[in-house]
């Protein structure tokens, strides 16, 4: 984005998009490593729920400062929930420690996703949601280009009750 913005021959506007998906997925491999990186770039301790929330707000502000107008979200479902802070913090801590159940991590993801909506209502980034996609299905493309490169395949999704 920065190179295109600095290129005087490129006359279109380029706006980055905030993509927090992988940081909201405690059940995904490598999540604690992502929290370490998030802590590093945000200057916040993202290994606690409060620190994670502060780090997310920090990164959203950073992207907005760079010209972002939206955040982009893609999860397996549209489930949303607002957990009591103590319950969410407890599940977050258990997820960091590696002993949260799959059910608890799903609740946490839904809570963190819902909190992104709160942040969007406060910072003005439009929340773009494209759920229910099967990613990385093409082994050759995955090995050549890496994870999450597009070519997603839609899967069945319940919408009304989730929201």
What is each stretch, according to the model?
Residues 19-39:
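Enzymes and membrane/adaptor proteins characterized by extended Gly/Ser/Thr/Asp/Glu-rich
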Residues 2-13, 33-163:
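Histidine/acidic residue-rich metal-binding segments in metalloenzymes
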